[in-house]
Amino acid sequence: MPTLLQINVTANWGSTGKIAEAIGQSAMKRGWNSYIAYGRKMTTSKSNLVKVGSKMDNYIHFAYNYLLDMEGRSSDRATKALVRRITEIKPDVVQLHNIHDHFLNYAILFEYLNQTEIQVVWTFHDCWAFTGHCYHFVQQNCMKWQTECGKCVQRNRFVDRSRENFLLKKSLFSKCKNLTIVPCSDWMSSLVKKSFLKDKRIEVIKNGVDLSVFKQTTSNTQSSPLNRPFRIIAVSNVWMAYKGLNSTCKCNRILINNLF
């Protein structure tokens, strides 16, 4: 029986956690074993869960990130324990989601993966994998990641290791011979093709929705208590500029006579 192991910061919690859970359930319906390794925050899962590290590991890793700009470069013992677990599970496919956020040492993980024949699928939910440390660069309008990060414009760190981080990621991720990158949008795909990962196999798979709930229907707007031609809803876990808050407000102004 083939085995899928996914790695994400959460398990069946939040957007990426629920995406991993859905993928695991889909794999199990097709006869696969499913494991999800996670750093923190979880709810009940139908997959086999593998906890990575402890709360103390998370706190120490957070300090490494905040004080030393070393996200993804702490949690040595926790990641070595995960690698040992991977060798026990013997997965046919390792699918990565968000491996940042204070729980995993990506150098230790990729030094292991790069020596194996395991197929690695990495779903890109943000831009962290090909930048010096930021998840999104649009707000800063910074394109250094296309060549080489350094002297980061995000001045919210005591130490700037953006160039060092960028070069380490480039060295490790580029050497993963069985890596397939799965951007969740055409826009993300266009960015990956401008990064140091442009020569990797890139397959766009857009985030899905439950079509039994979200489907096209015919409605009688005149009988609606809202009495509006149509409605627009925008959803985000947190509302910030980089999440599209400004664009949503702009949409409201343009469609001032409609409800969204």
PLM region spans:
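A short, basic/aromatic alpha-helical/loop segment that forms part
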Residues: 14, 211, 239-244
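Conserved donor-binding/catalytic core segment of Leloir-type glycosyltransferases
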Residues: 182, 226-243, 249-252
